[in-house]
């Protein structure tokens, strides 16, 4: 299974909607500088979606001699752009912001009546971004009309990544399985999630991770869900 996180989803959209001949005229590297060799015969673009302080990114940007290697730096949010230009003095003349995009997601049609309907909550983020906080909150909730479905593990970044990292979060998965008001489902594809967002009333994401542009939140908002999250990032 290939990784299909936010970066991969955005690249798939780009390849779907932009003419291949045009894309072939540039070389686009996503997030990690020089993970593919720089092209000598076409413009080099670094499409930056990761936060400025990531250990596989920070040292490269801190060395200003690297800044001339790319012709353009494209950021997925103004927040991300501002951090890179502030902390690394990246030349703004080479920087541009193109925000993340999503498919057209039909909004849920059935109205939610809190006194009559069960409140169905979805959480579909990686486990290190606040799942521990959310499960702690669910332990305190005693109302039987509130139920959480958790689509969270490391498989979104591929099976090799999951095998190496899922054991670190097994206690969280076990906690989710023990709670009566939580259904631990694990990984489902982005297409599956988008099809089923209409079945939920609320998306809850108590992020402890600095998001650069949260796609899961954007999709949930587009589907008409009530959304609760932090302003971290």
Residue ranges and their predicted role:
Residues 226-229:
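Short hydrophobic beta-strand element within catalytic cores of glycosyltransferases
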Residues 27-56, 67, 71-75, 96-99:
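Active-site proximal beta-strand in glycosyltransferases
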Residues 195-200:
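Short alpha-helical donor nucleotide-sugar binding micro-motif in glycosyltransferases
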Residues 162-191:
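Nucleotide-activated donor-binding/catalytic signature segment of Leloir-type glycosyltransferases, i.e.
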Residues 113-130, 135-139, 149:
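Conserved donor-binding/catalytic core segment of Leloir-type glycosyltransferases
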Residues 71-85, 90-108:
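Donor nucleotide-sugar binding/catalytic pocket of nucleotide-sugar-dependent glycosyltransferases
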Residues 194, 217-222:
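Short alpha-helical segment that forms part of, or immediately flanks, the ligand-binding pocket
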């Amino acid at each position: 299974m290939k990784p299909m996180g936010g970066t991969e989803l955005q690249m798939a959209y780009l390849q779907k909607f932009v003419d291949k001949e045009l894309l072939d005229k540039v070389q686009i590297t996503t997030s990690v500088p020089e993970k593919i060799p720089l092209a000598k015969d076409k413009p080099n673009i670094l499409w930056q979606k990761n936060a400025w302080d990531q250990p596989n990114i920070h040292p490269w940007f801190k060395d200003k001699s690297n800044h001339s290697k790319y012709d353009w730096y494209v950021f997925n949010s103004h927040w991300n752009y501002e951090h890179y230009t502030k902390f690394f003095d990246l030349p703004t003349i080479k920087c541009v912001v193109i925000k993340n995009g999503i498919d057209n997601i039909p909004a849920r049609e059935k109205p939610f009546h809190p006194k009559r309907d069960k409140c169905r909550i979805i959480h579909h983020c990686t486990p290190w971004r606040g799942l521990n906080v959310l499960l702690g909150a669910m332990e305190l909730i005693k109302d039987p009309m509130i139920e959480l479905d958790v689509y969270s593990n490391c498989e979104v970044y591929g099976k090799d990544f999951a095998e190496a990292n899922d054991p670190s979060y097994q206690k969280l998965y076990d906690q989710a399985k023990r709670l009566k008001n939580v259904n631990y489902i694990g990984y489902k594809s982005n297409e599956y999630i988008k099809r089923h967002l209409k079945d939920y009333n609320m998306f809850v994401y108590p992020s402890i991770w600095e998001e650069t542009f949260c796609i899961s939140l954007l999709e949930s908002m587009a589907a008409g869900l009530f959304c609760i999250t932090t302003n971290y990032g």
